[in-house]
UniProtKB/Swiss-Prot annotation:
It comes from Clavibacter sepedonicus. It catalyses: NAD(+) + (deoxyribonucleotide)n-3'-hydroxyl + 5'-phospho-(deoxyribonucleotide)m = (deoxyribonucleotide)n+m + AMP + beta-nicotinamide D-nucleotide. InterPro entries: BRCT_dom, BRCT_dom_sf, DisA/LigA_HHH, DNA_ligase, DNA_ligase_AS, DNAligase_adenylation, DNAligase_N, NA-bd_OB-fold. Keywords: DNA damage, DNA repair, DNA replication, Ligase, Magnesium, Manganese, Metal-binding, NAD, Zinc. This is DNA ligase. NAD(+) binds at D54, A55, E56, Y57, D58, S104, L105, E135, R158, E195, K326, K350. SMART domains: LIGANc. Zn(2+) binds at C444, C447, C463, C469. Residues 1-22, 786-807, 819-833 have a biased composition (Low complexity).
């Protein structure tokens, strides 16, 4: 849970500043909120799932929106209130640009807010009665199916609404999505929007199977859907490959809308003029639709539907977190339009979380990667919002005290947003007198080191034994293997626990991450490990035996020969076992990781504040870990994208002996910590790198480049890879799906280039794509027709200039020369244009 103030109180407190100090405070709070919201978005749309409840997240967005409404000068186009979803940054899947942007949905939280939304819709529509379609909001993974002439071309995740990830093969593996649409008369291009989910009834069985094969369990069905769909076959053992396919085949999909098919063509070619009729068309094409939707003549009937569905939501096959309400008339969709992130013709009614009672059996404390000690409630198993819950985080000792819970209490439990378990408080009238208070331990439960705040005034207690606390080492090893770092397949939660805290042998193969690249098969095979809970890190107990659950992740039973004897050639393990495929895969992938990019090595080292952006900047500027370590604070801070705080964090990290030992042992094991062929610190810029002093923004899908590849190409050429367009931007490389950045570049007069020009730019520099000056407009006196007046000449010249401008309009920015480093565009700013009929990411389903 965030330590920041959230909720309606915070939103109500967001009033216009009256002094420069007040405005500065509002600006600082906006920066905090944006960073926190983006962090939660990245977690929610990535594999890890949500880090806060839906209610907490919604409160953060509402507070940010309230401040921006009060101070419009603080609103920007890249604010979370103006953008959609998360980024598509994984290196596993190819980027796919949607033909029509996938928008999000605005939310309402009460019947009063729903009525206010409907009143505005009807007022803006300028007509009498408006019909509304209502359907369940599926809590799953948004998907976009692109069909060309009735044939499936790609299936992609939503991503940021413009560019998603290509998951076509996995979607086809599901077996419920047709490769070819039924019927005839299909348009040349249509996008079908839907939601992929994991059935609630099969969720517990899935997690049981995950544990059997040593895979992590999922916190909820939505995470199961995202984790199952966003995986690849490469590097997986046969057992894990079969598990992957089995998980994918259990996924279900329901479609709820159409994109990239203009309303006029829908009406003309398919005789469809209402959202409810779209579902009939989709069903006729053989696509899976929900039958659970209703059309109502007024908003009061919609409110009744909302209440009825809220009471029965546990009976639905998938998780839901609200009701989507859409204007049924497609013509009104065009008239009402959309904001930069959501249509005005639809909204989502968000339900308050479901609440149940259960018994608080104990409060245990677990320690995470950063040493933070977090208390968890251990409860009697209870079903809430469609799945069984036994544990919930209590965040810190102050939260435990504020909630007033005692061990042994009957407590009220809910799933915030129907996803994250949360203990609300005790049912005091049911106390028997046998309950007792929780006392926060003074020692780390993993290594017995005294817990203490990181600094004076901190609420959280932390274990300072960062080097050898098993929980922290385990967490850092998982981080090294994560997709954002070295991306090592086969080194997940179970493997990390096995390497750092095995039941057998007594001495763990890894005391710290320093020994990771020194591992051998002989280290792996003997390991036996207890199974730990994915959320708390606590040891799981076998319900039949009462003992800790054990697995041997790196060995399997040896197959007997026909004569009943074992093959004596196997050198590892006992006489009945041999190395598993998991062991082979892990060692292979560790070897591959040794040549990962330098910026990924920097991220893997768990240096505070050093994320991918700063790591890329450091790697691009200095070129090697040795040079970074030898740099002064001033040299580090001077790198664009680094600054003083990160510079201090780097210096502090390298001051620690065991940190330097990690680098030394990794290098000795063959990890490459330098960029091959790098000319030296800042050489690309200082020695005339082809983009020295130039700021370049890449947006949309650039052929031949991933998102990360485009950024790296800019920085490798000595340029600054910008994340937003401003008057200081020199070039915008725009591909399909460029969105608002393209619009802003056009408004500012920034040179816009395509993928081919971008390649020339980063390889050869601005001169390779320089454009000639526009021909000068002739003087009016010289162009006057014989016998014509000066006014005639002026008019003729103006007409010629207007015609020339019209002809060149699509390439108007190309009239500029290649900019020099100090060149600046006019300080103009505009709101980006938006599509008006983009189907929102509102999973649609309704009983």
């Amino acid at each position: 849970m965030s330590d920041t103030t959230t909720g309606s109180d915070a939103a109500d407190a967001a009033v216009p500043a009256t002094t420069p100090a007040d405005l500065e405070a509002a600006s600082a709070r906006v920066d905090e909120l944006r960073a926190e919201i983006e962090r939660h978005r990245d977690a929610y749309y990535g594999e890890t799932g949500g880090t806060v409840s839906d209610a907490e997240y919604d409160a953060l967005e509402r507070e940010l929106r309230a401040i921006e409404d009060a101070h419009p000068t603080l609103r920007s186009q890249d604010s979370p209130t103006q953008t959609v979803g998360g980024r598509a940054e994984t290196t596993l899947f190819a980027p796919v640009t949607h033909a029509e942007r996938m928008l999000s949905l605005d939310n309402v939280f009460s019947e009063e807010e729903l009525a206010e939304w409907a009143a505005k819709v009807e007022r803006d529509a300028g007509r009498g009665r408006v019909r509304y379609l209502s359907e369940l909001k599926i809590d799953g993974l948004a998907i976009n199916l692109r069909y060309e002439h009735g044939v499936l071309v790609t299936a992609a995740t939503r991503g940021d609404g413009v560019v998603g990830e290509d998951v076509t093969q996995n979607v086809l593996t599901m077996g419920t999505v047709p490769e070819r649409l039924a019927g005839s008369g299909h348009p040349p291009l249509v996008e079908v929007r839907g939601e992929i989910f994991f059935p609630v009834a099969e969720f517990d069985e899935l997690n049981a199977r995950q544990l059997e094969v040593g895979e992590r369990v999922f916190a909820n069905p939505r995470n199961a859907a995202a984790g199952s769909l966003r995986q690849k076959e490469e590097g997986k053992s046969p057992a894990r490959l079969e598990l992957m396919h089995a998980r994918i085949r259990r996924l279900r999909m329901l479609v709820h809308g159409i994109g990239a098919w203009p309303v006029r063509e829908l009406e003309r070619d398919a005789h469809v003029s209402a959202q409810s009729e779209v579902y009939g068309l989709l069903e006729a094409w053989g696509l899976p639709i929900s039958t659970h939707f209703r059309v109502f003549d007024d908003i009061a009937e919609v409110a009744g539907f909302v209440r009825r569905q809220g009471a029965d939501r546990a009976a639905v096959e998938h998780q839901i977190d609200g009701i989507v309400v859409k204007v049924d008339d497609l013509g009104l969709h065009e008239e009402l339009g959309a904001t930069s992130r959501a249509p005005r013709w639809a909204t989502a009614y968000k339900y308050p979380p479901e609440e149940v009672n259960t018994t608080l059996l104990d409060i245990v404390v677990s320690v995470g990667r950063t040493g933070r000690a977090t208390p968890f409630a251990v409860m009697e198993k209870v079903e809430v919002a469609g799945s069984e819950v036994r544990q919930a985080t209590l965040h810190n000792q102050q939260v435990v005290k504020a909630k007033g819970v005692l061990i042994g209490d009957t407590v009220v439990l809910r799933k915030a947003g129907d996803v994250i378990p949360e203990v609300l408080g005790p049912v005091v009238e049911l106390r028997t007198g046998k309950e007792h208070e929780f006392v926060m331990p003074t020692l780390c439960p993993e290594c017995q080191t005294p817990l203490k705040p990181a600094k004076e005034g901190d609420i959280d207690l932390r274990c300072p034994n960062a080097r050898s606390c098993p929980a922290q080492v385990r967490g850092r090893v998982e981080h090294v293997a994560s997709r954002g770092a070295l991306d090592i397949e086969g080194l997940g939660e179970v493997a990390a626990a096995a390497l750092t805290q095995p039941l057998e042998p007594e001495d763990p193969p890894l005391e710290t991450e320093a020994g990771l690249f020194e591992l051998t098969m002989a280290d792996l095979v003997p390991i036996t490990v207890v199974v730990r809970d994915a959320e708390t890190g606590m040891v799981k107990v076998d319900e039949k035996t009462g003992e800790a659950k054990r697995v041997t992740p790196f060995r399997r039973k040896r197959v007997l020969k026909r004569d009943g004897a074992f093959d004596p050639a196997e050198p590892w393990g006992d006489e009945a076992s041999v190395p598993s495929k998991s062991a082979e895969v892990l060692l292979e992938n560790l070897e591959k990781a040794k040549t990962q990019d330098l910026w990924r090595i920097l991220v893997a080292l768990s240096i505070r504040h050093v994320g991918p952006v700063a790591a890329r900047a450091l790697a691009g500027w200095f070129g090697s870990l040795d040079v970074i370590r030898a740099a002064s604070r001033e040299e580090l801070a001077a790198v664009d994208g680094v600054g003083g705080i990160i510079a201090d964090a780097l210096l502090d990290w390298f001051e620690v002996d065991w940190h330097r030992e990690i680098v030394a042992r990794w290098e000795k094991a063959g990890v490459v910590t330098a960029v091959p062929g790098h000319p030296g610190p800042g050489a690309a810029a200082a020695a005339g790198g082809v983009l020295a002093g130039l700021a370049v923004v890449a947006t949309g899908s650039l052929e031949g480049y991933t998102r990360e590849g485009a950024l790296e190409a800019i920085m490798a050429a000595g340029g600054k890879a910008g994340s937003s367009v401003s008057k200081k931007t020199h070039y915008v490389a725009a591909g399909p799906g460029a969105g608002s950045k393209l619009g802003k570049a056009e408004a500012l007069g920034v040179r816009i280039i395509d993928a081919a020009e971008f390649r020339l730019l980063v390889e050869q520099g601005p001169d390779a794509i320089a454009l000639p000056e526009a021909d000068p407009v002739p003087d009016a006196a010289e162009t006057a027709p014989d016998g014509g007046s000066a006014e005639d000449a002026t008019a003729a010249t103006a007409g010629a200039a207007e015609a020339a401008t019209a002809e060149a309009k699509p390439k108007r920015a190309r009239k500029r020369k290649a900019p020099a480093a100090a060149a600046a565009a006019p300080p103009t700013d505009v709101e980006a244009g938006t599509a008006v009929h983009a189907e929102p990411d509102g999973p649609a389903e309704t009983p």
